[in-house]
Amino acid sequence: MCKPHVPFWTLGAVTYLEGCDSIEKYHKHRKVMNPVLRKKFSWLYDILEEKMSEELGEPFLCDDNLGLPGFHIFGPKRGVMMNKNDMFFLEQPLASIHTDIQYKEHQSYWNKFKEVDLENVLSFTLAIKLPKNGGGLYIWDWAEFDQEMIDTFNFQHNDDKVSVLKNKYLWDNGSVNGYNPTEEPLYEEYTEGSMVYFIGHLVHQIAPARNCQPDDKRITLQGHAVMCDGIWRCYF
């Protein structure tokens, strides 16, 4: 086990951390954590289901057969201040540039349903606590990947991903007129108490902190959802 460069924790069963290595490990953790999350955050899941059902016009369910939406937590523990090294690394673009393909690890579950849409998958982030100078998401919303690129993109080094994103094939597709591939990605600013979501295989990256402060924290509720037989089934 390696120590991360930054103070970072997750709360909940996380597909991209556990399910990719062993789906059994993921479900073992799910069975432990889901009751805890339900006990502590059932009010939050109720709001999430209500608001997203209204927004999407279709039922939205936090599915206990999978890991419930969980948390990304960046920053120091209570009563502790970050040192210069911690703050330096939080200001670096260390997070993976990726598309969300966690659903692939749960194919055996999707097979239980008659109609499953794995092209228009959904991902969301609810900002609960943000650093003093804000936080957000980098997005490359003009990059249109075919299925082969979706399947392979995440498993490259970030430098190689940047090279892929500068490929004229991706941006000379009519989605953006005269886009300059050397420009920075678009930046989506988060607001505490508000949610950002997208549908589809959007290329994105957690944006690094800006002028990080010793007591900064970045806490977000994270989740994904797949449409199964007319219901959005949400998981982490």
What label would you give each PLM region?
Residues M1-E18:
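Intrinsically disordered, low-complexity, charge-biased terminal/linker regions in eukaryotic proteins
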Residues V14-E91, S108-D117:
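Signature of the catalytic double-stranded beta-helix
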Residues D141-E144, R210, A225:
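A short beta-strand motif that forms part of the nucleic acid-binding face
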Residues L186, V203-C212:
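Short beta-strand His + acidic residue motifs that chelate non-heme Fe in jelly-roll/DSBH
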Residues L122-L126, Q213-I231:
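A short hydrophobic beta-strand segment most commonly corresponding to one strand
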Residues Y179, V196-F198, D229:
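Alpha-helical transmembrane segments of integral membrane proteins
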Residues E188-H204:
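Conserved metal-binding segment of the jelly-roll/cupin
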Residues V80-E189, R233:
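Catalytic core of non-heme Fe(II) oxygenases with the double-stranded beta-helix
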